[in-house]
Regions:
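Radical SAM/AdoMet-radical enzyme domain recognition
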Residues: 1-4, 13-134
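Generic recognition of stable, solvent-exposed alpha-helical segments in well-folded globular domains
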Residues: 16, 82-85, 109, 113, ...
Length: 332
């Protein structure tokens, strides 16, 4: 079992909170072998907090969108500097830190700069597309459209193939999904009933992304509900309805086994809980999955051919071969 401390900003809880809660959870749930993780902007990281997090081997996730000017443009002045100072402290204490990058309709135009920045830092890259805001008068101000996101994923696939020392987690996940025919991360898997989030007041949600949305409260910790009871709540039933909808709407899709309609939050939250379709990024996922499957099939055709003949065929292809990348991913 993994406990992830997520935002708001979990470092606001202060060092005393973690000195109490980490030993408590480790002791009381020792039979479940608990592990911990944290998503933080790192601004409040200091030596004391870093010490206790390092003691319990808590990996950290944070957000950097690329070079300093681009990150500050998207996240506010001095975000980059403050985040990197916290990163420095965390690294000095031996903490593992990884960054996620948000691609917007603006930053995607600088994809080369962003990838080269991550590569120059020696970081593993993880990304997600900017989604329509659920608040404000201009919800699509930063939104990366699904078609553009799909082309970005294919571009990143080629980059990962031609730069084997640089790891892009999203590309790894897509390739692993196709090769194993199973969802590699929660976006491409039926997460219902296996993933929950708990708000500061003890409210239980289907996922951290629903926290703060009262209509998605499944129950409360104080009532000690079972998983079955949580799934019988109105919010739980809406999640199950999404799964049933995917079975019907995606039944003819070649990728249904390892995509499962994408993320339920992406599909349901923007519509006020109404089930109107699958994840809006279906177009992007399908574009990337189609590309991987097409290349993989071409490279694996005519298995009786000699190694020299197969290499010759791969060389004649206009697109970089994907199987060497998949082999590296699977063998990890």
């Amino acid at each position: 079992m993994t406990f992830t401390f997520h935002g708001g900003e979990p470092l606001l809880a202060g060092v005393s909170f973690y000195r109490e809660v980490l030993p408590l959870l480790s002791k009381e749930l020792s039979h479940m072998h608990p592990e911990f993780a944290m998503q933080t902007n790192l601004w409040l990281m200091d030596d004391e907090i870093a010490d206790i997090l390092a003691e319990y081997k808590v990996p950290l996730g944070s957000s950097i969108d690329g070079p300093e000017d681009l990150t500050d443009y998207q996240r506010g002045d001095e975000y980059f500097t403050r985040c990197m100072e916290g990163y420095r402290i965390a690294i000095e204490h031996g903490l593992l830190v990884r960054f996620i990058c948000t691609f917007t309709n603006s930053s995607v135009k600088r994809k080369e700069d962003i990838v080269e920045f991550f590569k120059s830092q020696g970081w593993v890259m993880k990304l997600h597309p900017a989604l329509p805001s659920l608040k404000g008068d201009n919800p699509n101000a930063w939104t990366l459209e699904p078609e553009e996101y799909g082309e970005l994923l294919v571009w990143l696939l080629d980059y990962a193939i031609t730069n084997p020392s640089f790891e892009i987690m999203n590309v790894n996940d897509l390739c692993r999904c196709v090769f194993t025919r199973s969802g590699a991360v929660c976006t491409y898997a039926d997460c219902m009933g296996s993933t929950f989030a708990i708000g500061p007041d003890g409210a239980i949600y289907p996922c951290y992304r629903f926290i703060g949305m009262p209509e998605w409260v499944m129950g409360y910790v104080k009532d000690k509900p079972s998983i079955a009871e949580l799934m019988e709540s109105p919010a739980g039933k809406r999640m199950t309805a999404f799964k049933d909808h995917v079975d019907l709407a995606c039944r003819d899709c070649a990728h249904i086994t390892y995509c499962r309609g994408g993320c339920p939050y992406n599909a349901i939250a923007p519509t006020g809980g109404e089930l109107e379709g699958v994840d809006p990024h279906c177009t992007a996922y399908k574009r990337a999955f189609d590309e991987i499957v097409s290349r993989m099939n071409k490279e694996m055709e005519a298995p009786a051919a000699s190694p020299m003949q197969r290499r010759s065929r791969v060389k004649r292809m206009e697109k970089p071969a994907v199987m060497p990348l998949i082999k590296r991913i699977i063998e990890k």
